[in-house]
Design a protein with these regions (language model features):
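A generic structural signal for short hydrophobic patches within well-formed alpha-helices
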Residues: 10, 42-45, 74, 116
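Residues at secondary-structure transition points
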Residues: 20, 36, 40, 52, ...
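Histidine- and aromatic-rich ligand-binding microenvironments
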Residues: 6, 37-38, 90-91, 112-113, ...
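Short, well-structured N-terminal submotif of metal-dependent ribonuclease cores
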Residues: 1-37, 46-62
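Active-site neighborhoods of divalent-metal-dependent phosphate/nucleic-acid chemistry enzymes
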Residues: 65-111
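Short, hinge-like loop/turn segments at secondary-structure boundaries
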Residues: 52-56, 84, 125
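Generic structural signal for small/hydrophobic residues in well-ordered secondary structure
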Residues: 6-7, 45, 77, 101
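Acidic, PIN/NYN-like endoribonuclease modules and their adjacent C-terminal/linker elements
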Residues: 1-2, 98-125
Length: 125
């Protein structure tokens, strides 16, 4: 199984406050699952990070595989924006994250499902 983690999950894992979520994270990490993150999520986490959090963020990102943004993801995200920007207020970052999951055949782990109305997108619980 391949799982792409959304920014909200990565934030909670890096801060460690939600014990149930951290437990679920550890269970996933110890399985044979491939855990991915989007370059968009990296940008969002680094933008909000404080210096005492830098080492933990470096360790978190080093343990996972980054999905880089390329032309294929750009096209897919652009299609999502065209389809869902007005009806669901989908923003560029969420469109790129959804495209990353769909193009990699990954399930998206997020607590913000309303940001992702794409029917072809599978979720991880």
């Amino acid at each position: 199984m391949t799982v792409l983690t959304d920014s909200d999950i990565l934030i909670e894992v890096s801060r460690g406050r939600d014990k149930a979520l951290v437990s679920q994270w550890l269970e996933l990490a110890q399985s044979d699952a491939l855990i991915l993150y989007s370059a968009v999520s990296a940008a969002e986490l680094w933008a909000g990070a404080r210096p005492p959090e830098y080492t933990a963020l470096d360790a978190l990102f080093e343990a996972l595989l980054c999905v880089p943004i390329d032309a294929t993801l750009g096209r897919c995200a652009g299609e999502y924006l065209r389809r869902y920007r007005k009806s669901h207020a989908v923003e560029l970052g969420d469109a790129l994250i959804a495209a990353s999951a769909v193009e990699r055949g990954a399930r998206l782990w997020t607590r913000n499902r309303k940001h992702y109305p794409m029917p072809e997108l599978a979720f991880y619980d």
